[in-house]
């Protein structure tokens, strides 16, 4: 793990310890009393105020007899709440089921499909707390005598908590909601803080106020959003099943930082399974399964930065397994993204992300997809830059393995592209990308297609092919060990003192697919450069080799040669322009090496043959 991730994890741990300690000390409460319960009949609201903890039984016993709070099924501890319940000034509501000694195994929240006043209720903590454990909570339509499944035409019951600054503008008034071992469903509609389960900090106070809670071992389903946070700090979402929500499954939003999202099964939601959006930093998103969602499996959106996405399984999502949108400095590794539309996509200026050891295979379109998009980035020009894609598997995708557009200065290294149904990479309007030591095999179009307006580099690679699509595009083939390349256009390798290269463009490649093979053969001139063209390179039989070299200058050039693919411990003659120059015995790896000094102004021909 990098120092940066260790640092982020350490900071997160400290934050969790701090906030847990803070709330255990500051939210320790007194017993519930009648003085803390106020019934407002005109607004159909119950207010619980002060430093107290109240259960439904206590509210029923101590509050007004007119509060519409009833036990509809005493034997099964089923309650019905027909009023809005508001927690203020540090008050805490306890909703515990019988498995942990509580009084409510199911809570039904009034949610009638009608336009009349007070047709639905909410539970809200505005500087307070809600503790839900081992129970079930649903909306309830009294007329239908059943769960309220309608969310579009009429409003629907929901639960939310708020944190804010006090009227002095300085003192934080913070709330917390914990949900464990519970079944929460059929809550919320499309309205601010009304999505179903919501944690929110008032806008403008993120730097001094947080909202808190842990969500563990629950089933959360058929809400408008499964979970929504806004300004949350150090929350944990652990081992939940989140499914069949209208929009998102898990949606940490604005400035929700230092969250742990681990071990959740998020599926069949209407849009993205897990989306973290707008300045959500230092997240740990691990070991989740996100599948059959209407959008992306996991999405990092609008400056969701400095986060770790690891060991997630993402399949059968309508868009991409993972999407990075206008987000930066994240590490994505060891994720498995299959059977989606795309394995991964980056857009709107996403930069400086590390994507390594992932599997982006068997997707219905692209394994990897990069594009600027039409959205305005929060900074920069929107092009995809300075990302590293290393040691990923991109196999058997239905279309292009890597679709690259408006992407610059990215590194693709050590990736496996096998059995895809189109190009290895289709590159358009993208410059200064480096493709290094990737494996290309069995793709229907087993080559890099430099389609349009693209100038890039292939570096330190063994076997590959390239097609140039227009006159302003090129691909520079380079090798840091000065290797010579044999290629289907018989183009010379330009050997320099510190590297070798071939610049492939439309002029020398035409419309052909040009195949390249990096030979076990390097030439390193001390000065100047040499154009080296292999003519014969036998790797079996007589192991003979032949090449030409020329500099075009009249001064003497000394060049170090390493020739491989020879039989070990066998003597070989080096013949220059038909004259025996010297003999060498190949070492145990089948190589000979020598320095040769001469004037290479005109073409010189070299032969290596087994000594007679």
Report the location of each language-model feature:
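Bacterial N-terminal signal peptides that target proteins for export
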Residues: 1-10
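Bacterial N-terminal signal peptides
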Residues: 10-21
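Beta-strand/loop edge motif enriched in small/polar residues
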Residues: 23, 27-315, 321-326, 331-333, ...
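Predominantly extracellular beta-rich ligand-binding scaffolds that present long acidic/polar faces
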Residues: 376-377, 398, 404, 416-429, ...
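Catalytic cores of secreted or luminal carbohydrate-active enzymes
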Residues: 483-537
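Surface-exposed beta-strand/loop patches in extracellular or lumenal glycoproteins
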Residues: 551-568
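Short strand-turn-strand beta-turns centered on an Asx-Gly dipeptide
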Residues: 576-579
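C-terminal beta-strand-rich structural cap/linker in extracellular carbohydrate-active enzymes
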Residues: 587-612
